[in-house]
Amino acid sequence: IKASAIKILEKPKNILNILQMAIDGSIDKSKEMFEDIIVQGTFSNDELLEEFYNAINDVTTRDEVKAKLYIKLRDVDDTLGRGGSPLIQFIALLYLAFISPHLKGVMK
């Protein structure tokens, strides 16, 4: 694990930083840092859901983007409850964060 990931692991609130990086266009770095968290296995799915919920609330972006992220987080929660892969689900959330600031209109 890289030193940057260890710093992230020590402070779960840095999920906010990971999400903000995705929104700001640094999807590769955001994804890499999140993958390190998953590989480490430090947090349960419920803890990650809570951290992402808090991060969406605090992230700097338009309300429309936050709404899309909350909807996706609801879907992530549902899929994880049915045995889905946390890595795939949360990375999909990060990619939505990456593209959402550039989308127009309502997500369908």
List PLM regions with ranges:
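Helix-rich C-terminal "collar"/helical-bundle subdomain used as an assembly and partner-interaction module
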Residues: 19-108
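Alpha-helical tetratricopeptide repeat
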Residues: 14-18
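Long, charge-dense, solvent-exposed interaction surfaces that engage phosphate-rich ligands
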Residues: 1-13
